[in-house]
Swiss-Prot record:
GO terms for cellular component: extracellular region. This is Maxadilan. Salivary gland (at protein level). It comes from the Eukaryota. Keywords: Disulfide bond, Secreted, Signal, Vasoactive, Vasodilator. Residues 1-23 form the signal peptide. Potent vasodilator. Activates mammalian ADCYAP1R1, a PAC1 receptor, and induces cAMP accumulation in host cells. Causes the development of erythema following superficial injection into the rabbit or human skin. Influences adaptive immune responses mediated by host dendritic cells. Reduces surface expression of CD80 on host dendritic cells stimulated with lipopolysaccharides (LPS) and induces concomitant increase in CD86 expression on a subpopulation of these cells. (Microbial infection) Probably plays a critical role in the enhancement of Leishmania infectivity in the host attributed to sand fly saliva. Vaccination against the protein protects mice from infection with Leishmania major. Several synthetic peptides derived from maxadilan act as antagonists for ADCYAP1R1 in functional assays and in rat maxadilan/PACAP-38-induced increase in blood flow pharmacodynamic model. Interacts with human ADCYAP1R1.
């Protein structure tokens, strides 16, 4: 039992050391996730606005743009990845 705990501790420390060596802690990883999701959302919004007519676009709220849901889904996925330790 002690050996399993020791091996687990070594693995956790190795992962932590790798992340520190990469210069990216949890805050850094969270910022990268937000940046990635913002880029995906922006791309979706650009595609949507390029096909909207002026009349329908001016009546749209920003929450109706596809990037809003893309960002939310992306952040949900990133949260799952963080909680699973990937």
């Amino acid at each position: 039992m002690k050996q399993i705990l020791l091996i687990s501790l070594v693995v956790v420390l190795a992962v932590f050391a790798f992340n520190v060596a990469e210069g990216c802690d949890a805050t850094c990883q969270f910022r990268k996730a937000i940046d990635d999701c913002q880029k995906q959302a922006h791309h979706s919004n650009v595609l949507q606005t390029s096909v909207q007519t002026t009349a329908t676009f001016t009546s749209m709220d920003t929450s109706q743009l596809p990037g809003n849901s893309v960002f939310k889904e992306c952040m949900k996925q990133k949260k799952k990845e963080f909680s699973s330790g990937k």
